[in-house]
Structure formats: C-alpha cells, structure tokens
C-alpha cells in the first residue's frame, strides 16, 4: 500500500481548530474552506487566519492525485506534526485577540492508514508551507515522492533561534509546516484522537465525542 511510504514517517496527520469550531467538525467533518462556506458552517467571527495569506491560497491551484487541479480553498490542509509554526502562530493570534489559547486550541490527529485506504480520496502535499514564496514550494501528488520532504525538520519539536527574522529560521519554519492536502472533506471516522492543552478543554470535548482526548501541555507556545 502506498500509504506506508508516509506512515513510516508519521501515523497521523494533524489539523488545528478552536473549541468554537470543534462541535461542528465532529458532526460534519473537517471541511475545505469553500465547502464550509457552501454548507453555511464557516464561522467568520472565529477565523484566525491572515486575510492576505488566504487570498494567496485561494488563488493557488494544485494538481491532485486524481489528476484534477484544485484551489487550496477546495482542500483540507493538514500538517505532518502537531508541533509546527503555523499552529503556534494561530495560538499567538488567538492570544492577541483576547482569547485564552490554552483553553481554545485543539489539534485533531487523523489516521493516515484509514484515510488513504479510501482510494476515492484525492490528495497532494508540499515540501514547505503552501503560503511560502511560490518559487520555493514544490507540490507532489504521489506518495512515492514523500521522502523528498525534510523529515528531520518536520519531526522536530519546536526549536529556538537567536534570530527569528533571518533566512535560516524562515527556511526551517516553512519546511516544518509542510502540508498534506485532501480534497473537500475529512470525515470524523478518520479521527484517531483529539489533542488539547487544558483539562477543562478535555472535559468539554469528552461530553461531545467518544474519540480519545489527550492533554499535551507542550502543544502550547507560551
């Protein structure tokens, strides 16, 4: 099975959401941005993303494993590790907006083997964050290319730098946030576990799902 090319590096994909969105995700699944808007479940008030970056992603098309070309906004964007700078940036934005990120942040772990055993799932992946400079990002749609990603960087936990503005950090940051993209939806049946930072968040989630919930304190940036 081609999914084994990926599971030798990580058994899970990871998706960041907030406590305000998790109930609808447990009901409908993780939806692409466009599909969430079409179904009327996109909550603009809880959207932490950068508007300019989202415009760039909307206008970025990627060739999928099915042969189809899709806008990033028609894809569910996941990561290979829960420790990546995009998730940390989301926590920082939540904190600035006045929300308590340790209570709001949730990471969904997605079972790769179950997901990719479904041959109807079209996908692609990148060797850097999709929001990085276009000339630096390579896209792939065959798992035979998965070893082209920098797994030493991807599988590191968070790393401190002396200078967070130089090219060394930016290169590490973009590789750390390489993405795996699935067309339209990841259904709840593929969710393996929900990760959160606080016991209160765990208690809230457990009232709404039978999926395993684990508290991991070092998911927090601060």
Regions found by a protein language model. Give the residues of each.
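Active-site-proximal loop/hinge segments that shape catalytic or ion-binding/gating pockets
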Residues: 1-77, 84-222
């Amino acid at each position: 099975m081609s999914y084994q090319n990926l599971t030798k590096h990580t058994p899970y994909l990871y998706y960041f959401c907030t406590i305000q969105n998790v109930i609808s995700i447990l009901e409908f699944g993780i939806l692409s941005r466009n599909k969430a808007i079409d179904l009327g479940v996109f909550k603009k008030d809880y959207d932490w993303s950068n508007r300019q970056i989202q415009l760039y992603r909307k206008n970025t098309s990627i060739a999928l494993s099915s042969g189809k070309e899709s806008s990033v906004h028609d894809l569910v964007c996941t990561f290979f590790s829960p420790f990546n700078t995009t998730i940390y940036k989301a926590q920082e934005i939540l904190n600035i907006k006045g929300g308590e990120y340790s209570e709001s942040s949730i990471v969904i772990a997605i079972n790769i083997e179950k997901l990719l055993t479904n041959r109807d799932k079209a996908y692609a992946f990148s060797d850097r964050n999709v929001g990085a400079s276009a000339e630096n990002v390579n896209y792939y749609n065959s798992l035979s290319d998965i070893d082209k990603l920098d797994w030493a960087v991807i599988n590191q936990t968070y790393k401190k730098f002396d200078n967070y503005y130089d090219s060394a950090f930016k290169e590490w940051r973009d590789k750390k946030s390489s993405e795996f993209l699935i067309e339209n939806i990841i259904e709840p049946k593929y969710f393996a576990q929900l990760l959160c930072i606080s016991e209160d968040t765990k208690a809230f989630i457990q009232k709404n799902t039978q999926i395993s919930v684990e508290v991991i304190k070092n998911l927090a940036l601060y």
